[in-house]
UniProtKB/Swiss-Prot annotation:
Taxonomy of the source species: Bacteria, Pseudomonadati, Pseudomonadota, Gammaproteobacteria, Enterobacterales
Species assigned in the record: Escherichia coli O17:K52:H18 (strain UMN026 / ExPEC)
Similarity-based family: Belongs to the class-V pyridoxal-phosphate-dependent aminotransferase family. SerC subfamily.
Pathway: Amino-acid biosynthesis; L-serine biosynthesis; L-serine from 3-phospho-D-glycerate: step 2/3; Cofactor biosynthesis; pyridoxine 5'-phosphate biosynthesis; pyridoxine 5'-phosphate from D-erythrose 4-phosphate: step 3/5
Ligand binding (pyridoxal 5'-phosphate): G76, R77, W102, T153, D174, Q197, N239, T240
Localization, UniProt: Cytoplasm
Subunit note: Homodimer.
Positions contributing to L-glutamate binding: S9, R42
Protein name: Phosphoserine aminotransferase
Co-factor(s): pyridoxal 5'-phosphate
PROSITE patterns: AA_TRANSFER_CLASS_5 (PS00595)
GO biological process: L-serine biosynthetic process; pyridoxine biosynthetic process
Chief place of localization: cytoplasm
Molecular function (Gene Ontology), one example: pyridoxal phosphate binding
Length: 362
């Protein structure tokens, strides 16, 4: 079978080695004669999986000891509600920075629970989409927390700055599409959350990192399944967790550690992004409308000079083993999502195709 490279924004490509191991263990896991999907989440065998996954995740991100790691349901959208329900306390407002589609979605959900102070960070610089630097973000004095999304998958916009708003500002961030792709200083955040389906594992699992002093403040109306304290007190097993997604994510963590960890992923991701953006920038046939300072290394949207060729580009790229390149309906064009599991070889195959397609149709 020809090599297939999956550029889907999520659920996304998983490491080939991880899929191979999961395939080998599917019907007889851990010598039990059953699948990991069939064992009790409270049995000692799966408890070991859960504990190892948390330890490896903590190691990869150097999570400080005063932070709890929760393995949850609900995805990023679940956390759009969970953050205000857990962190507001007796306050009625929170700061929300709007830099794209997912930040705006979080704001919409937050309005059910508080009065968000929304700061629109989107700007245009020399005709390109960009984000105002953090020093220009206008925060309020009475906010319970400040929320932002460091990587906008649809817009192809990234905010790579590290928050530095002082110890009194609780920073909550949606890292769904950039978690584990580069080092981050967890201590600068109060809450970090990430859906698994991009850089962690299969859809169905969400990981939350929460500073322990923020526990115990949940609104009385907060559903128990979203209550950080309840999840923490029950070892993320208040109800039956998505065990297979948890297991597979644990395999991904071990794969990351075996391949140099987050620091090495950071280097490779930079190489992949430079290669792809380089082809786009050196061409009049392709274009990307995001300012270089805010370009995402995970999600690269691009347009063809002649949109009439979009359908042909997608058909021929798919036939060449380059899958899921269609852009999101909101922005159109193409989008290549190049998360950790996408090898440099895959991006090279894409850029070779792009160069050849331009030669034939430019």
């Amino acid at each position: 079978m020809a090599q297939i490279f999956n550029f889907s924004s999520g659920p996304a490509m998983l490491p080939a080695e991880v899929l191979k191991q999961a395939q080998q263990e599917l019907r007889d896991w851990n010598g039990l004669g059953t699948s990991v999907m069939e064992v009790s989440h409270r049995g000692k065998e799966f408890i070991q999986v859960a504990e190892e996954a948390e330890k490896d995740f903590r190691d990869l991100l150097n999570v400080p000891s005063n932070y709890k790691v929760l393995f949850c349901h609900g995805g990023g959208r679940g956390q759009f509600a969970a953050v205000p329900l857990n962190i507001l306390g007796d306050k009625t407002t929170a700061d929300y920075v709007d830099a794209g589609y997912w930040a705006a979605s979080a704001i919409k959900e937050a309005k059910k629970y508080c009065t968000p102070n929304v700061f629109d960070a989107k700007v245009t610089v020399d005709g390109l989409r960009a984000v105002k630097p953090m020093r220009e973000w206008q925060l309020s004095d009475n906010a319970a927390y400040m929320h932002y999304c460091p990587n906008e998958t649809i817009d192809g916009i990234a905010i790579d700055e590290t928050p530095d708003f002082g110890k009194d500002v609780v920073v909550a961030a949606d890292f769904s599409s950039t978690i584990l792709s580069r080092p981050i200083d967890v201590s600068r955040y109060g809450v970090i959350y990430a859906g698994a389906q991009k850089n962690i594992g299969p859809a169905g699992l969400t990981i939350v990192i929460v500073r322990e002093d923020l526990l115990g403040k949940a609104n009385i109306a907060c559903p128990s399944i979203l209550d950080y304290s309840i999840l923490n007190d029950n070892g993320s097993m208040f109800n039956t967790p998505p065990t297979f997604a948890w297991y597979l994510s644990g395999l991904v963590f071990k794969w990351l550690k075996a391949n140099g960890g987050v620091a090495e992923m950071d280097k490779i991701n930079q190489q992949k992004a430079e290669l792809l953006y380089g082809v786009i920038d050196n061409s009049d046939f392709y274009r990307n409308d995001v300012a270089k300072a805010n370009r995402s290394r995970m999600n690269v949207p691009f347009q063809l000079a002649d949109s009439a060729l979009d359908k042909l580009f997608l058909e021929e790229s798919f036939a060449a083993g380059l899958h899921a390149l269609k852009g999101h309906r909101v922005v159109g064009g193409m989008r290549a999502s190049i998360y950790n599991a996408m090898p440099l070889e895959g991006v090279k195959a894409l850029t070779d195709f792009m160069i050849e397609f331009e030669r034939r149709h430019g």
